[in-house]
Amino acid sequence: MCAVLEPSMIRWLSEVDNIVVSSLPSDYIPSGPAGVKAESCEVELPGSFGVIDEEDSYIRLLSAFATLVCRMSGESDVAMYSKANRLLKLAVPPGVAFQQLRASVTEAVEGTLALPAVDFDELSALEREKKQLDYYPQYFKVGVVTAADKTKLDQFRYHKFELLLRQVTSSRFEMVYDSERFSPDRIGELGEQLVQFLTLVEAKDDADVYAISLVTSGASRVLPDPTTDLGWGQFRGAIHDIFQHHAETRPDRLCVVETGVGQVAARTFTYSAINCASNIVAHYLLARGIRRGDVVMIYSTRGVDLLVSVLGVLKSGAVFSVIDPAYPPARQNVYLGVAKPAGLIVIQAAGQLDEAVEAFIRDNLSLKARLPALALQTDGAILGGTLPDFHLDTLVPFASLKNTRTDVVVGPDSNPTLSFTSGSEGIPKGVLGRHFSLTYYFDWMAKRFGLSEDDKFTMLSGIAHDPIQRDMFTPIYLGAQLLVPQEDDIGTPGRLATWMATHGATVTHLTPAMGQVLTADATTPFPSLKRAFFVGDVLTKRDCARLQSLAENVAIVNMYGSTETQRAVSYFEVPSCSSNPSYLDNLKSIIPAGRGMHNVQLLIVNRHDRTKLCGIGEVGEIYVRAGGLSEGYRGLPEINKEKFIDNWFVDAGHWGGLDLSGDEPWRNYWLGVRDRLYRTGDLGRYLPNGDCECCGRADDQVKIRGFRIELGEIDTNISQYPLCRENITLLRKDQNGESTLISYLVPRSDQKALASFISAVPESIATESIAGSLIKYHKLINDIRGFLKKRLAGYAIPTLIMVMERLPLNPNGKIDKNKLQFPEPTELDRASEHFASETLGLSSFSPLEQEIRKIWLDLLPTRPAITSSDESFFDLGGTSILATRMAIVLRNRLNISLALSTIFRYPTVKELAKEISRVRGTISDDKSSNSGTTEYYADAKHVSEAELASKYESRLSLLPSGATSAPVYVFLTGVTGFLGCHILADLLNRSRKPYDITVYAHVRASDESSALQRIKSVCTAYGLWKNAYAPRIKVVLGNLAEKQFGLPKKAWHDLQEGIDVIIHNAALVHWVYPYSKLREANVLSTVNVLNLAAAGKAKYFTFVSSTSALDTKHYLELSNAAIESGGSGVPEDDDLMGGSLGLKGGYGQSKWAAEFIIKRAGERGLRGCILRPGYVTGSPSTGASNADDFLLRFLRGCVQLGKIPDIEGTVNMVPVDYVARLATAASFSSSGNTHMMVVNVNAKPRISFRDYLLALKEYGYQVTSVPYDEWSKALESSSDEENPLYPLLYLVLDDLPKKLRSPELDTTNAKFVLEEDFARTNIEPIIITSVSLEVVGSYISFLHKLGFLEEPAKGSRPLPNISLSDEQISLIAAVATARSSTAKP
């Protein structure tokens, strides 16, 4: 039988080759991968259809449905299921009349009936086998059948129908649809459209089927009316005037905060300071001849200087434009050539212009004004730098005008901005903005989205990307605050989320790419964020879910627009997870564009008859109608006529009757009502509720990673390569669904030079295959990349360049783009494996370079040829997200932690390897080397000798002789951390006898008010804050890493003379940083705090260390020996030298070094205590814990995995309130009078790790205990970025049982100081000093309350009912914890 069917199968395989399967736009993504959920409804046609015979009726219905499928899919070819179990392939070309289409459909139906019958499932299986596909091809998703045909949606195994039309009678048809894909509203609308279409063509069957209106009466109620008044004359005023009003009425209001990081201190600037500085800049520009409409170019970095420069330019009446120093000099020259600026401001922090740029300026521009090095000083003074032959700063002569307005009048049609977008001839286009748009929409946005002067906005957009304007202008319009991060805050994986939480950002503007940077490797929640506005690219449901997993209170607003529409955009709001947790579940994977903001319309216009709007579901071209459109392209009048079009839906002079009179000065700069549409070139559809979704481009312009790229611009540049004969660039999806730029190129085989770029292809690989081409032409491909790097921005260089003998053509002689797809991963792998051989010179790679190369190949979806160590990660297709993953992999494989900015700074294999070697310092590649573990010991000895004071006064008693009470002044660091705030509470909860305690709290903040608010927030989060604390807290601002904390001499002297007790609790806790990265924060800062005790009043010194300082084999053996001989563990008087060798983690090494140095200070007279806690866990009563805690992450990760590892051994887990009590008690202990004692914190009894994890099962979570090896393999194979353990994979998968082993500790001193404290103060003792099953239950309940764990099934025990207020829940995840058990591994 198979032999008989074979010819028919061959025929059918030909029929289905490269078939484009027709589909309709859906409303939902099915919840399950397999079945369908069938629903149906019947539709009645007008009575006249009842006289038509059923065969003709079937053809009419089929023709009408085929037309709608084409109009809704945007394709002119249809493939659908038809009667008698046949596949119908049909062309519905534009311009065809219905009567012609009916004839074509009749012929097509007869033709398919003439084909042999086929089993489509069998055909699919055969094609899968023949082409070695990973899936079963599908040939149809929709169909039209007759009444006799009982086909169901799930009729076939490999072809699940989405929609079937069944002709019931000549005047009635049934619509059977998958309700997992379509809403009843959409199906009802589709039925109305079919009826309307058939009715209209019945009356006029010679009409173009693409011109028949699909806007039904129901749709007209939700679609925009293109004839309404959009508030043409409602100018709100110029943005700089509104800013100036805020500055003059509320001068001291905080405007900009440049947040600090590391040794870079934070800077704050008021509205008055920025107003004064920008006035000086404006007066300078005017004095140098800058006039209204002149362009002033700003060479800038991210920061307050950019805002000052922008406002200065606007106040002068000029137009500002921004150049990013990251662009290649040749590209900068292109922008300068388009802008033709009359002025130039170079911001000092951006560096100097490249000589090639300076040469271009000298040869091509006539600048009236130039500020060579603008820099706003911390005290508000503004400097502009000095020009050649002048010794005076350019701005000094204008300082006296800082409070004087320029009074330059601008109007709604004056131009404030010049932004760049891609151009089709290789030259970018400059878009001139209008003042109208910069302010018109903010009042509505504030009301609609709840924005106010109390919000904190972020400055995260690319500095030369027009969304940066929204970052700056929104807060200054409202009188709000703008937060500016450091580049490392953006560049280091996970740190941007911490930055958001730390600084309490409430509103942010993001591109989807920046949103992914924000969430990638992030663990710190930031519940303060309430609005996130996304612009610039396609926003996915995954992007939203990831953001809301960290910011549960954020409502996400997807905004659709372009540089040309300025602020006139659409919006679609995704409510916050806290208000509607399941909202995202009902959305498709791409977030819709939504509907226009106030007085903005998205008009989806019929591409074949622009006098008609599209019906719901129909693909058309999107035009934006608004009064806030930009002016147009600078110097390109013909393109402006094509893109900015008078509204043809109203007659000329339609708005002449509006009364828009007035005598405001700005009316001199208004061109009157201009009802214009901007032709976006995007394709879109209306949804049933009137919202819009985007579905592609009408031309070859695309967006990738937030940047808009003209494919023609890329092709123009490639075509100029000497060995290129023919080329085309397309956007294709790789195997991971990521948009990828691919250029297909045919070389000039007639050029002899080509031979030098051709390599031999091994016999095992076919030369004509994709792998063969990549191998044969890899030298040519690399040369083309180098050619493009000099001409294009990095994001516009194609990820893949495929060299072909010829480009495929369709029958019309045009390039057949359907045959140019993303290469099969197996082909890329074969080429990559070949390039890994040493025959291509890879032996020249160092071992480290080869390891980096391997990591890149694992990450890059294109598996590129990396044959030189000078290859750039980003040229090969690397993105910011892939760079984030690379940082994680480097951390895992090479035990090196790099900021993401480092990967951008050193993008080649060679540069990155060199930087890794530099960061490692003296660490050798030889794994047997001990230098990495001896570095900290040698450094500790050196610091002790070089940095410690020669003598420290010994404190004998805190109580004067005979006194029953005395004031005591405690200096506490790390107060805003998890343990630190508990120490603060324990200090201030004590009665005033015998010690009346005042705490001098060290906090990093911009001012004392902000610092106290930080303290209050963290204490409130953990249920500790009392208003009575505030008068007893004195804030100390300063940097512990600087000598004398960088304080003025008097402030430092007052501390030295006033402080009685120092509790140094601050530390940088990091899972993988090497000692060198932690040295400043954990070692040198400790020395600086120690030296506070070197002069003035004698002081006690308590240092909060960690048992990580004892994590060596020596102490495990010492502990075992002590217990065997009847002791209790490592003695507290141990000399610490057992940790001078063998400590592996940088954190433990830094704590050991700090202890060593403190002991040396003790030998010089210092008195006090070293406190060594292990895992500091949450409060037993409330369960409130550090949300980023390693052990809590472990619980969450195990629940998600459904497995727990069976690990023996105990864990030294001690509740935070017990550790805090010990820190306080030890700081006042008489034992510290005679020596620098050690207080070990050891849980008695310790909980076993097995019992800790089994608590999940006890409380109802479905987990299975398995051997560690099995668990680790399951985690490694299933874990992704959503798993809480993802950032810690390198820890938990690397012999975790061994990592968890820790020595038992003697606690004689701990018992003594607690007993002494109780005797002295009669304070209520801490009862729970270790973690039991009940306490673990409170931690699990805490995770459940925060939403980190779902409701458990019924277990042996009910979850404890812990008390957490809504305020605590909102704050607890936002506070940054400086100490947690995350450090311990």
From Swiss-Prot:
It is an enzyme of class 1 (oxidoreductase). It comes from Eremothecium gossypii (strain ATCC 10895 / CBS 109.51 / FGSC 9923 / NRRL Y-1056) (Yeast). The gene is LYS2. This is L-2-aminoadipate reductase large subunit. The keyword Oxidoreductase applies. One of its GO terms (molecular function) is phosphopantetheine binding. Binds 1 phosphopantetheine covalently. It catalyses: (S)-2-amino-6-oxohexanoate + NADP(+) + H2O = L-2-aminoadipate + NADPH + 2 H(+); (S)-2-amino-6-oxohexanoate + NAD(+) + H2O = L-2-aminoadipate + NADH + 2 H(+); (S)-2-amino-6-oxohexanoate + AMP + diphosphate + NADP(+) = L-2-aminoadipate + ATP + NADPH + H(+). Transmembrane segments: none annotated. Pathway: Amino-acid biosynthesis; L-lysine biosynthesis via AAA pathway; L-lysine from L-alpha-aminoadipate (fungal route): step 1/3. The keyword Iron does not apply. Belongs to the ATP-dependent AMP-binding enzyme family. Heterodimer of an alpha and a beta subunit. GO terms for biological process: lysine biosynthetic process via aminoadipic acid. InterPro entries: AA_adenyl_dom, ACP-like_sf, AMP-bd_C_sf, AMP-binding_CS, AMP-dep_synth/lig_dom, ANL_N_sf, Far_NAD-bd, Lys2. The modification O-(pantetheine 4'-phosphoryl)serine is found at residue 880. Its cofactor is pantetheine 4'-phosphate. Catalyzes the activation of alpha-aminoadipate by ATP-dependent adenylation and the reduction of activated alpha-aminoadipate by NADPH. The activated alpha-aminoadipate is bound to the phosphopantheinyl group of the enzyme itself before it is reduced to (S)-2-amino-6-oxohexanoate. Keywords: Amino-acid biosynthesis, Lysine biosynthesis, NADP, Oxidoreductase, Phosphopantetheine, Phosphoprotein. Its EC number is 1.2.1.31, 1.2.1.95.
